[in-house]
């Protein structure tokens, strides 16, 4: 039985493949190449490239690089028992969309893997030589694309399948850097009234694509509310702060525990008022909170510094494009906050198409952190992909799209960090376009794939390759 592109995607959903743990999916792809007698290579980190020779009559056509990443963001609802390392995703179809039960679906970027496998297994269409690159760890460190052997790739035309809107092609992507803000924690014994402040219900989303929606962030909201408490004379001393799971996902919920000597009813009423104000700022999100009393035996010394930093730290879109209406070119996401026995850490992800703007924003955060005695460690810096106004591949894509659908292909930049940034740095002469089906609310448990658009992208690409 011949598998179609949706069959391949469903198979991918049955194989655990969170970022950094793509081995099982990589094994499946390697076995696929062997079964189809296709040349391939796999490196130590887990990247795979599979080659499909040109169709008869296409030997003199320039080769094409198709690319996508194997890993997925592993996010789930708080009441989910799903284990991303061992369990297959529980998928279901509803109203033309494919969903996963209480977890991310991994359409970002499992659809790319599915499309490439479907094309590699299909001998019914005309095409140049195909180089299909499957990378790992895109959602976390980008280590996969940085470890790709340059000698693997001969093509100078690249089609990235990491897009998530039909009829759109990215024309640039942001570079970025992750900052870890650290406060060494000295815990002191205290037996004042304890509280558990849980901020929840926010939509979250990808900190590249959804940041322009100006969605609420649980870490930022908690910081603003608790800073207001301090400003109005309430006693707030943190015991622990834990929020978010991924640096590149807008924080949907967080638990902030603290002690206070302030009047219980007055404190609760004040926090309620401040949270009602926050709800009014995000009318399209089901923002909610709980504030429960608890008994705890310790607090973090000088935790005011953390509250002030959270309230004052830049967040969201810092700068919009001059050329593309309402598209961010500089942003910052508060992704994770974690308390250990030794420290409290806040992980930020900064994105910018422009290296100068990125350095200025990093300096702003470093300066703010230093005022409150916090250290800053930059890691996981990655490169942007600059707009090429003379792209011949994009010109061909636009013409083919107009011919197929009688409408214009939309060109958009993205604040998302794409592997195209590394590819364009390694191969400055690489001509790059992106495409993909409609993937909605990626990086959240509400993620869903519009099934008909998966077929649409697959079929369009299959036909377009015959024209290249």
Give the role of each language-model region.
Residues 70-72, 104, 133-141, 162-166, ...:
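Acidic, glycine-rich active-site loops and adjacent beta-strand->loop/helix elements
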Residues 329-345, 349, 408-463:
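Zn-dependent metallopeptidase/amidohydrolase metal-coordination segment
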Residues 3-97:
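Acidic/His- and Gly-rich active-site-bordering loop/insert found
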Residues 16, 96-99, 139-140, 148-351:
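Midchain, well-structured core segments that form catalytic/ion-binding scaffolds
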Residues 327-412:
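Substrate-recognition/cap regions that form aromatic- and gly/pro-loop-enriched pockets
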Residues 58-140, 145-156, 191-194, 314-321, ...:
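Active-site metal-coordination/substrate-binding segment of hydrolases
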Residues 217-220, 224-241, 387-430:
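Active-site-adjacent substrate-binding region
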Residues 215-232, 262-263, 305-309, 319, ...:
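His/Asp/Glu-rich mid-to-C-terminal helical/loop segments that flank catalytic regions of hydrolases
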